[in-house]
Amino acid sequence: MAHEKFSIPENFTLAQSLQLLYSVVKNQYKNLADLIINSKGNKDTVTYGKIHKNLDTLLVYVNEGLRKIEKTYTLKKGLGNLVVDHPELRSIIEDFQILGQDIRIARRKAETLMAEGNGSPSLSSSSSVLGLGTGNGLRFPKLWRMGSKRDKLKEADEKEAKINKQADNIRRARKLEEEKKLGAKLQYERDLELQREKLIELKVKEKVEFEVAQKLEEERVKREEEERKHREQAEKKRISTLKHERKTNYKSRASLDNFSSSSKSSGKIDNSLIKRRSLDVVRTSGERVRTPVRKSMEAAEIGMAAQLAWSQYQNGANHSKVSNNGSHSNELQIRYKPTPPLKKRYDYKKPTVNRPIIKSPTLNRQNSKSSRNIPTNSKLKASKSNTNKVSRRNEQNLEPSSPVLVSATAVPAESKPMRSKSGTPDKESSASSSLDSRKEDILKSVQGVDRNACEQILNEILVTDEKVYWEDIAGLRNAKNSLKEAVVYPFLRPDLFKGLREPVRGMLLFGPPGTGKTMIAKAVATESNSTFFSVSASSLLSKYLGESEKLVRALFYMAKKLSPSIIFIDEIDSMLTARSDNENESSRRIKTELLIQWSSLSSATAQSEDRNNTLDSRVLVLGATNLPWAIDDAARRRFSRKLYIPLPDYETRLYHLKRLMAKQKNSLQDLDYELITEMTEGFSGSDLTSLAKEAAMEPIRDLGDKLMFADFDKIRGIEIKDFQNALLTIKKSVSSESLQKYEEWSSKFGSNGS
């Protein structure tokens, strides 16, 4: 070892070189330590001197190896500052510190044993010192101390004590870390054991429930079988009893007939029979004659016989054949007089309501005043209708959110249909028939617009079969409240929203894609009982010159006639982009016509209020876009409200996930839902739906080729690992840069206060 030097193999990295040096020194140290243990009983000072010298040589070997590593890998700052740039080498450097301490301890022990053999006190001389200096606690000295001069022993001892202290700290930190890892491992094993116990408990519970259900099913089948057998026995017993009674009656009659015939032929009657008297003297006084009796008679024949008897009685056909028996039959016929036929029931049919409007409170007061002047006879005749009115008012009061709806035509109040949110089939059919009749009336009296364009609007743009309610939309509480205040309440109670409280004529919903803007528009139309026009660019654009403008004009005309109505323009940025010099002439004409018709809504409302004192132009233009900054300035001015529809927050995502998984077989717990919700930060509503669909496909994929023969009930439920796998495929569709852009536009132009 004294003549050997550490050599670094080619293509070795810094970590590999340090590891090679450490393994060589570690093996040499183990051999010398074993030699000290084996020579402990021997007092040969020569052996201990060799061991002491070899340990010094080992320290010199380590020193030269570290210096060579520094030189080879050009470590200008030394190995002490290596951890700053290479934190992965901290462990090997700490191992060198601990190994240096072990070598010094072994050397001190060999020195002590050698001194005991010579009978002189040991000298704490050190020819070489392997340790780390002060500073960050990870700095190697440039040169290891060599030599054993007595004037430097004190300094060497102090330095060695400092190095030992650092090594002890490293040992203590490693011990604490190992204890911490051991504790974490034990805790993990305990958690696994608890989960295993819970799983076993659930399986046992499921098995017990299955066995109990199976046993109950067997008992039910057994009980039904016993009941069936009991019924069969009872039926057999009843049949046998009837047969026995019939047989007994037949034998008694036969014996009585035989007895009467024999008594007549002999002319002798027993004295016991003479003493017997019957209570029915009249019937028994005559001669007994047996006549064949019909055992059964059909109901139709009985009715025909009764009708025949009644007709004969009316015509007097029986008077010529009157006899004692005939008088008795007439009495029977008179006794059973047929009842007169019942009158047909009067079915009341409600008149068709053409258009529902709001009943004004002043009209109720006028009706109450006029009812006081009605004569008493008319009041008595109308008492029944008044009771119906009271009952219907009580029914209407059960729905505080819906106002009283009356017809625009002169229809009695008791015959006016109610529109409720539940939407029974009869009410929906009546509403659809009313809408159809209104459309026919409007098409018959079209003025100022093209009739064909109106028909195209009704066929392609009018939506009547989609019903979406507030409960179908998760979250977005602020947007719902703003829409209720700005649209729903004014449409349902226009008598309260007049003047400065007049409802807005334009509202813009903007935000990232997949946040539910289209569903909100449909929910507004449903909740406000409005006619819904869903407009897209393809429904208004035409290749013929001037046709697009006609369609726009017809759209607003039909919206006014079928008010209250909502014109919903999805992706409105495609139709109302900012105008420029390079724009096409046809698209500019469409924008101009759309803006003109839009501006006419406010003036049309004022004129209709002045003429008819009714609200016939409750029309709202509702737009949705993902690019609000691309809309023309004039169109943006007409949007009185601009609502930002953000991405769903934590609570909304949790509620949406639970609603998606409510009708799907799954084994998810509340903690699983919360974990999935945290993992889907930044997902939109459509992204969550796509994620749930992808997770629902995982149990199907596990079946593989067994899919065609698998039982649906035996397919496993959705687990949290399915969502983890789905997250590898489904990513969020909105970037943070896009969200920042939406928030900046909302703070600049949006209706933040609503």
From Swiss-Prot:
Modified residues (Phosphoserine): 255
Binding site residues for ATP: 511-518
Keywords from the UniProt entry: ATP-binding, Nucleotide-binding, Phosphoprotein
Segments for region (Disordered): 219-269, 317-439
Alphabetized GO MF terms: ATP binding; ATP hydrolysis activity
Annotated Polar residues bias: 317-332, 361-389
Compositionally biased region (Basic residues): 239-250
Pfam families linked: AAA, AAA_lid_3, Vps4_C
UniProt GO BP: positive regulation of translation
Low complexity bias spans: 255-269
Cellular component aspect of the GO annotation: cell cortex; cytoplasm
Miscellaneous comment: Present with 259 molecules/cell in log phase SD medium.
Stated family: Belongs to the AAA ATPase family.
Protein name from the UniProt record: Probable 26S proteasome subunit YTA6
Gene: YTA6
